[in-house]
Amino acid sequence: MPKTETYPRLLADIGGTNARFGLEVAPRQIECVEVLRCEDFESLSDAVRFYLSKCKESLKLHPIYGSFAVATPIMGDFVQMTNNHWTFSIETTRQCLNLKKLLVINDFVAQAYAISAMQENDLAQIGGIKCEINAPKAILGPGTGLGVSTLIQNSDGSLKVLPGEGGHVSFAPFDDLEILVWQYARSKFNHVSAERFLSGSGLVLIYEALSKRKGLEKVAKLSKAELTPQIISERALNGDYPICRLTLDTFCSMLGTLAADVALTLGARGGVYLCGGIIPRFIDYFKTSPFRARFETKGRMGAFLASIPVHVVMKKTPGLDGAGIALENYLLHDRI
């Protein structure tokens, strides 16, 4: 089939809260981007059909190729989302949507593919020197959950992406304050993973733990209705609520620890890339937050980490971009 006949391609980036859809009408050209709330639809197929009906006027041809990035491990045909109610069969969904091929990949595999094609203005660098060519790149990011993957670019330019579930590693507190936060979480959960703190709901959990800290009983606190990640972040930045600022500082410190752990584990001299929608909302604060200092606080390996740049991904739809690149790679090489 001529390459032009594979367009438009149906792309999706499906997280725990939102599903983003787009149509790739030409290489790296994505149109008709829509964001739908997962809770508004009984199933993935229902959401896709609704999306396609909204884009009906833009569709000259029905898509026959699709690529969906989903926030869950892919272990066969049956897919169960980690942080929402959707479950689906890849093959049944392909047939239901009249697609010739439906590629389904982990969302942070898509993020890794997207990073392979990013320009300098798509990224905000936080410390470090420069990336080492062909060295592993670590990709992680807090959102509804916490995703982790690895990107390796070989000397011939080919890409290898290693998916993982690093967000579910056990969290290790760094200091007495984080021990207090961990103990609060441990009273609620049998397993306290990094994702428990480094996610949208994690901001709320950190706030709740800190609000019970001795000496903070009389500090101004949020009402129950205000206890959301967005409001905690806003109050932290405007300076009205010191406990919110402490919450955000603690969040960034914890993220620095995890990012350093991942970088050391992978030998990520190619850089660390932070994805997701949370950090770009407060990027100016993040540049001077405790993140970078904590990232480099690794004893004998501090100098090793000091040279590694951390990049915050500022691009709006990297998940869709990566889903498109993964599909292109599949169609060219019949592999990803």
Swiss-Prot record:
GO terms for cellular component: cytosol. It is found in: Cytoplasm. It is an enzyme of class 2 (transferase). ATP binds at residues 12-17. GO terms for molecular function: ATP binding; D-glucose binding; glucokinase activity. The keyword Signal does not apply. Keywords: ATP-binding, Cytoplasm, Glycolysis, Kinase, Nucleotide-binding, Transferase. Its EC number is 2.7.1.2. Belongs to the bacterial glucokinase family. NCBIfam families: glk, PRK00292.1-3. This is Glucokinase. It comes from Helicobacter pylori (strain J99 / ATCC 700824). The gene is glk.
